Each structure stands twice: as C-alpha cells, then as structure tokens.
C-alpha cells in the first residue's frame, strides 16, 4: 500500500500489529486466520524474522493483553517483566524498533541480551 502510494522505501516501517486482532470483516486490514488472538500474537513474535522484506520491523508489545493473559495480570502496569521479556525476544527474533512504556528497563534488557548473541 505504501509503495503504491509512492511513499519512499526509506520511510516504510513494518508493524505486525500485535494486539490488533479482528476475526471478522472484509478487506486487507482484517486478520485472516482461524486461531485465537493469543496464538496469533505469539506466532508473529516467534516468526518476526520471516517478515523481513528489507524494511525495519517495529514491535509494540508493552503491556499488551496477551502478556496479561499469560501472566494472569489484568492491570497493564503489572506487566512490566512480561513486557520486557516479550520486547527482548522480539528484538532477538528480528524487531528493529521497539515502542514501549518502559524505555530504560527495556533498553537495559535488550543491551544485555544482545551481548549473548555476539
């Protein structure tokens, strides 16, 4: 869509839309899978490397409901450690940009994890 609209490639960022799940609807902006939202979000994070089309990948998982579902935490602010874990795994799996509510903690976790990958 962006390329058809003549947006320069250097301004395109892929966002796999974690937490944005609708099973019904029409058009290209509706999820066309039969699984539940938790399975969908986990699958996307596990397979981020397969999304690479020479564009940066932005991930936004901080405080998302899938983390609350896994941890049994309904209050988003109680999901700090789950958010940091999901963000770090996302970067390991290919995310280039992280949008987070926890900038300092996420930066530290990713910095440590990256040392194990070298």
Positions of predicted regions on the chain:
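Active-site-adjacent loop and "lid" segments of alpha/beta metabolic enzymes
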Residues: 1-4, 8-10, 20-118
């Amino acid at each position: 869509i962006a390329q058809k609209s003549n947006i320069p490639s250097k301004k395109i960022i892929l966002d796999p839309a974690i937490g944005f799940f609708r099973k019904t609807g029409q058009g290209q902006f509706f999820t066309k899978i039969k699984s539940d939202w938790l399975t969908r979000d986990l699958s996307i994070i596990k397979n981020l490397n397969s999304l690479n089309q020479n564009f940066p990948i932005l991930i936004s998982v901080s405080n998302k409901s899938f983390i609350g579902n896994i941890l049994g935490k309904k209050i988003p602010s109680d999901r700090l450690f789950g958010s940091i874990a999901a963000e770090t795994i996302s970067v390991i799996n290919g995310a280039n940009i992280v949008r987070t509510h926890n900038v300092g903690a996420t930066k530290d976790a990713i910095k440590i994890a990256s040392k194990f990958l070298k």
